[in-house]
């Protein structure tokens, strides 16, 4: 028997450990990629839902104001979801963040010099804080019937 051929018979323990380590690393990388993909997909879905919801909220505000719901020198609570008839989707919270008033030359938070224009910032955010979308609306005081604005 040739002693050289005995050493080349099969895998050694070291070769098996290296192969196992390489395969383990590959599995960890693949699983990590899948987990990251699922997390990114979840955030994107929540952003899309929040974006659609904040636009619905903005439409409710516009309808509310058009129906003479405009409040001079309003606080954000005047345009809260409950005040304008908006219900946020399950797992989301809607808020009226800020109202600023047009002074004739600039937007200001106070003192109130409301000349019929308000800038309202509204937000819809997921309750797990992964996604939030904001919209800034400019509200104009509607003219009454027969009025020349």
Protein language model regions, located:
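N-terminal leader/signal peptides at the extreme start of proteins
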Residues: 1-11
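Alpha-helix initiation/capping motif
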Residues: 6, 39, 43, 111-113
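N-terminal segment of the canonical double-stranded RNA-binding domain
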Residues: 9-13, 92-93
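Aliphatic-rich helix starts adjacent to a transmembrane/signal segment
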Residues: 11-55
């Amino acid at each position: 028997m040739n002693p050289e051929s005995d050493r080349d018979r099969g895998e050694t323990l070291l070769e098996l450990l290296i192969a196992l380590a390489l395969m383990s690393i590959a599995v960890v990388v693949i699983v990590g990629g899948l987990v990251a993909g699922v997390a990114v997909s979840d955030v994107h879905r929540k952003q899309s839902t929040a974006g659609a919801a904040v636009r619905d909220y903005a439409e409710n505000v516009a309808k509310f104001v058009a129906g003479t719901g405009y409040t001079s020198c309003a606080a954000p609570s005047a345009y809260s979801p409950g005040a304008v008839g908006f219900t946020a989707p399950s797992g989301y919270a809607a808020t009226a963040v800020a109202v600023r008033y047009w002074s004739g030359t600039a937007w200001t938070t106070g003192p109130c010099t409301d000349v019929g224009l308000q800038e309202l910032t509204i937000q819809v955010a997921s309750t797990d804080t992964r996604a939030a979308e904001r919209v800034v609306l400019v509200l104009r005081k509607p003219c009454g019937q027969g009025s020349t604005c």
